[in-house]
């Protein structure tokens, strides 16, 4: 089976799924093989559930009469099909990557652009070599543009995702100390993320630049076309303000106050507003979109629980984002406790970076410091240290945190959000 022959079948499908538990009528099921399980064994069952077609990489399960098709690699075929579909699309596609803030920025951009256009965008964090093709394949004729989030933890990954998504516009939120192990250090992070810049330059596509970020400015000096924000002489200039721990932006005499905490979210708001204005959206509509957006994804999420204010930032953590969160949280009025968990994938830099964060937390003078995870426990000798979130939960059952404000921040693998119900 090749993509051109399969494409007419795809056009009749409702959607593509790789999860056999979520098959609906007229879906196409891609049966991926794992180390311990071959989803091809579910092919006939998928057809019985109403699937329009199934793609397998195990030839013994092929049954063309039932629309069960064999390919050598389901992953390769998924990517090839998405590239073929991308070739048929004539809409602006915005590619987005960065060490921190890319998911929040993606959702803000989607909220703003949706004020005027029908916009498809990356659902959740489907931002890898499987998620990006799935997002491209979810773009329907009614969509007028798309926002594609691209994640990476090693070199050449963004390059691959760019060949699939072929963005017309691109933005890198920032360069931080994330996935140091896979990228081979901070310089490797810059090189890996900049693969988006390389693609945009070679394809003569548009780059969005935060001119307050010296790395972005240096990497895009000779790029055209470009959209800029951050400086008074940029294409778009906004000023930051805050109110009740929430960050907002001001454009001329108009203000938009978001439901996001942290000055680090200001540039995310600016990126969304800049793209909105570039695409002809009135600032009043941009204001409405930014003020209406409510984070629900454990990223800079502020929630009230009884008489306490909780800042939930448990989806991801690295030294850059952890430092920014601590500096923001210390500005909250009232007593403050931080519950911080390990920052994963730091490789040889891990012990030093955990020491640096713990030292920063102590210098900022929080009322209480609680750490979770083996890395922090190795360096935390002066305050409460737990090896796991489950261990923390057992402690919290008999020892409630008394502070008015509580920050929870950790890498996803720590599952720190499980402790919320016990705070």
What are these regions (language model features)?
Residues 1-80, 84, 330-334, 352, ...:
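N-terminal leader/targeting and accessory segments in enzymes
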Residues 20-31, 119-120, 130, 134-145, ...:
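Mobile, glycine- and charge-enriched loop segments
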Residues 96, 297-299, 413-418:
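ATP-dependent carboxylate/acyl-activation modules
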Residues 56-65, 171-309, 334, 358-362, ...:
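Acidic, Mg2+-coordinating active-site environments of NTP-dependent enzymes
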Residues 298, 314-324:
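Glycine-rich phosphate/pyrophosphate-binding beta-alpha loops
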Residues 76-207, 211, 215-223, 394-395, ...:
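Phosphate-binding loop of NTP-binding sites
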Residues 27, 46, 81, 96, ...:
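Residue-level signal for inorganic ion chemistry
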């Amino acid at each position: 089976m090749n993509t051109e022959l399969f494409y007419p079948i795809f056009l009749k499908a409702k959607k593509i799924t790789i999860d056999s538990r979520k098959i609906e009528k007229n879906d196409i099921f891609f049966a991926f093989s794992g180390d311990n399980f071959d989803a091809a064994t579910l092919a006939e069952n998928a057809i019985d559930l109403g699937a329009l077609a199934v793609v397998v990489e195990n030839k013994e399960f092929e049954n063309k009469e039932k629309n069960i098709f064999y390919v050598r690699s389901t992953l390769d075929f998924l990517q090839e099909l998405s590239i073929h579909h991308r070739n048929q699309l004539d809409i602006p596609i915005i590619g987005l990557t960065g060490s921190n803030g890319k998911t929040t920025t993606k959702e803000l951009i989607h909220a703003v652009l949706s004020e005027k256009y029908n916009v498809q965008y990356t659902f959740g964090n489907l931002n890898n070599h499987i998620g990006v093709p799935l997002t491209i394949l979810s773009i329907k004729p009614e969509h007028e543009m798309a926002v594609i989030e691209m994640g990476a933890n090693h070199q050449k990954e963004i390059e691959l995702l760019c060949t699939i998504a072929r963005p017309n516009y691109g933005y890198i939120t920032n360069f931080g100390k994330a996935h140091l192990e896979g990228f081979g250090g901070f310089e490797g992070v810059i090189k890996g993320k900049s693969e988006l810049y390389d693609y945009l330059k070679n394809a003569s596509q548009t780059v969005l630049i935060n001119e307050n970020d010296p790395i972005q400015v240096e990497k895009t000096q000779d790029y055209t076309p470009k959209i800029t924000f951050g400086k008074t002489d940029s294409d778009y200039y906004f000023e930051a303000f805050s109110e009740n721990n929430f960050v907002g932006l001001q454009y001329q005499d108009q203000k938009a106050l978001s439901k996001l905490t942290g000055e680090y979210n200001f540039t995310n708001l600016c990126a969304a507003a800049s793209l909105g204005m570039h695409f002809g959206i009135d600032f009043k509509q941009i204001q409405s979109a930014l003020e209406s957006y409510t984070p629900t994804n454990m990223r800079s999420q502020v929630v009230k629980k009884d008489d306490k204010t909780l800042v939930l930032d448990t989806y991801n953590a690295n030294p850059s984002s952890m430092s920014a969160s601590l500096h923001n949280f210390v500005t909250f009025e009232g007593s403050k406790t931080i519950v911080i968990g390990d920052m994963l994938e730091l490789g040889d830099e891990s012990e030093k970076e955990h020491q640096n964060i713990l030292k920063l937390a102590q210098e900022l003078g929080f009322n209480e410091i609680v750490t979770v995870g083996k890395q922090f426990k190795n360096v935390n000798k002066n305050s409460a240290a737990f090896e796991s979130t489950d261990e923390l939960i057992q402690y919290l059952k008999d020892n409630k945190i008394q502070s008015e404000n509580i920050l929870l921040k950790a890498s996803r693998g720590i599952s720190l959000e499980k402790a919320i119900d016990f705070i």
